[in-house]
Amino acid sequence: MAVLPKRNADRTEHSSLPIAQLILLTAAVLAVSAGSVSPTLSWNIIGLATATILTGLLITTENRARHRLLPAGAFRITTALGALYATMSLLAVAVTSGEIFVPLFLQVLHHQSPLVAGYLAALMAAGWTLGSIASSGVSGKGIKCAILAGPILGAAGMVALTVLMRTESDGGWMSLTPICIGLIAIGLGVGLAWPHLLTRVFQVASAGEQDLAAASITTVQLFATALGAALAGMVANVAGLSDPGGIAGTSSAAAWLFGVFALAPIIGVFTALRVVRFHSKNGESHKASRNRSRSDITS
């Protein structure tokens, strides 16, 4: 005689798709994308304003919805989960914003062939892989250092590219090497922090929301990537990539793009500090619980 396990009520409740939130999320990205196509500043502002309103509606709908898109507390920076999602999003935005236009900048400003420019742009991905491998075995204080190193290296790389990428060169290795180091630094930072940020999402999610937390990681990453790409196009367009275009327009676009999006990892330093603080508090509480358990056993 077999006894079937009891059905998990939480899992059943979250089985339906959060259609309203998905529509609002998609519409917010499309609003920024539509605004970025126009070279007119007013249309860019309208696109951003529309995306902001739609994001606000998304948060309101999510807080009231029966079927959630993200775990509880995901939209509040004061919670451990909110700080984690914010840090992940800011790192993803930094990588995406640079990755899209780096091949173009290298071709126009540094006279590289499309093939070479593509390989050099892939240095971000190589740095990400290297960072993930390097930080995979760390524990204790090493985890905190890896999480903080992510946005710090990202900010350093973005600031360096703000200065280096905009200056036209003959494409020699003397001028390309510092740019390559900046690209690697951005990817390396994300790679160092990312595995531990993912682990923390599972650790801080409430007991009935582990499955939702697992699914939400991809949702947050893709949303941040799409939004970062749309915003990058908007900044580059406004900065002169299309008008006046050429060397002058591309140089201006490179300076503005990396300068504006350097703010993402800089803000990420502060959200990463919150992640580390929450991690320390949880560690202390677990240690206190173990000590109480040992005291009860000995008594």
Regions found by a protein language model. Give the residues of each.
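12-transmembrane solute porter fold
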Residues: 43, 67-242, 247-279
